[in-house]
């Protein structure tokens, strides 16, 4: 009788432990919510960055003259538009920001400031033209009227790392549609409202401590381009925003 009583008491004492273990096991088997894009970021793109112009000086540092369209795969329709470029007319029409849209803004010299608007949206502010871009993570871009910066859909591209291990690195891909017609260059080289802008943001760390952001931009436009227009823009990370000075759009 004493042995049987001890056995019963042992079972009763062990029951809460077994029950707790079962609850823990069941909870572990339940699907966990996916991390937010902010928490899942394989690379930190936030901070202040200043553009370093190492190429295309004649098209980026000054407004090139009318007719200087070298290296842009323009259609005859695009050339006709560019040949009629008039910066005074653009200013009078309230369209001085034509060269500051998503198709060209990363090529305009100046600083950019990248922050998280919320857990699912990256925000990019530019000194040049005082523009704001919102990169939303998800499966569909939000509806809205065409604008200079359009509607941008973002996704992380993970690289490196073994299966089940944390990512070794990655980059950001951004696809922008819903644009107002703008300029690829300040001298009137156009892109239409049908343009699609695809960008790749890659951060690299140099042995000397410098941190760089390379933005590769691909513009496709069935109206004004007969091929992809590809550029790479380089930004060096700044220590802080003490030199941040936003400026308005200028037509020339």
Residue ranges with predicted function:
Residues 1-5, 9:
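N-terminal low-hydrophobic presequence detector
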Residues 2-3, 25-252:
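PEST-like low-complexity, intrinsically disordered acidic/proline/serine-rich tracts
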Residues 8-19, 23:
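Bacterial N-terminal signal peptides
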């Amino acid at each position: 009788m004493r042995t049987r009583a001890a056995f019963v008491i042992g079972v009763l004492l062990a029951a809460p432990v077994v029950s707790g273990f079962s609850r823990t096991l069941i909870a572990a088997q339940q699907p966990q919510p996916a991390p937010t894009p902010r928490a899942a970021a394989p690379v930190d793109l936030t901070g202040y960055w200043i553009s370093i112009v190492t190429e295309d000086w004649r098209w980026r540092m000054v407004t090139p003259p009318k007719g200087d369209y070298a290296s842009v795969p323009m259609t005859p329709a695009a050339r006709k538009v560019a040949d009629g470029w008039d910066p005074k007319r653009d200013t009078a029409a309230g369209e001085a920001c034509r060269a500051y849209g998503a198709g060209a803004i990363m090529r305009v010299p100046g600083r950019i400031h990248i922050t998280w608007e919320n857990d699912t949206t990256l925000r990019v502010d530019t000194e040049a033209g005082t523009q704001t871009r919102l990169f939303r993570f998800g499966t569909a871009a939000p509806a809205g009227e065409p604008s200079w910066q359009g509607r941008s859909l973002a996704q992380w591209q993970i690289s490196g790392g073994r299966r089940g291990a944390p990512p070794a690195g990655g980059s950001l891909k951004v696809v922008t549609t819903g644009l107002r017609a703008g300029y690829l260059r300040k001298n009137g080289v156009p892109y239409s409202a049908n343009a699609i802008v695809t960008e790749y943001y890659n951060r690299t760390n140099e042995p000397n401590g410098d941190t760089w952001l390379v933005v590769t931009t691909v513009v496709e436009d069935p109206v004004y381009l007969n091929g992809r227009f590809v550029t790479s823009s380089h930004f060096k990370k700044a220590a802080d925003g003490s030199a941040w000075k936003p400026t308005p759009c200028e037509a020339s």
